[in-house]
């Protein structure tokens, strides 16, 4: 904006069912957490109805199933977040003249995938504690449901080319499990409020720093 003015920005929107440009990105970022929350709430209601008469031994099966849903969520996370990083690096390489097409070099893809993996493992524990413990008390079944909802929304977003925030989707999915269990009062809404504040301030802060 500062360099070339608003007319040089591709604002976009929704074209052929896909979010494009700045407005499309903002729409995807706004809608994806809502879908995560609704998906988790509906899944929780469905699972509770199906397992109403299940034995308590189902806990072991649920925990084992989380190996699959955790892997699915990790894949969905990488499929979306790594693409965003690759896009930025490719844009820089194009501007520098290092490459001449939008096809990303393999070394860029590997470097970005490695960076996302290392960053998640090394620097994500504070966020993990907030999502896993501070929003609402989670049971194994809640974890399974929230992972399923989060992975589904994240992967669907990647398929349609929508850049979203996996952490936002996971946070809202965790809230959705609390709502689906009929325990909205037990959701720590002050923590949710702080997360929402971070969401709202992150984008303008990043834009100001870039400017």
Regions found by a protein language model. Name each.
Residues 1-211:
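Multi-pass alpha-helical transmembrane bundle typical of ion/small-solute transporters
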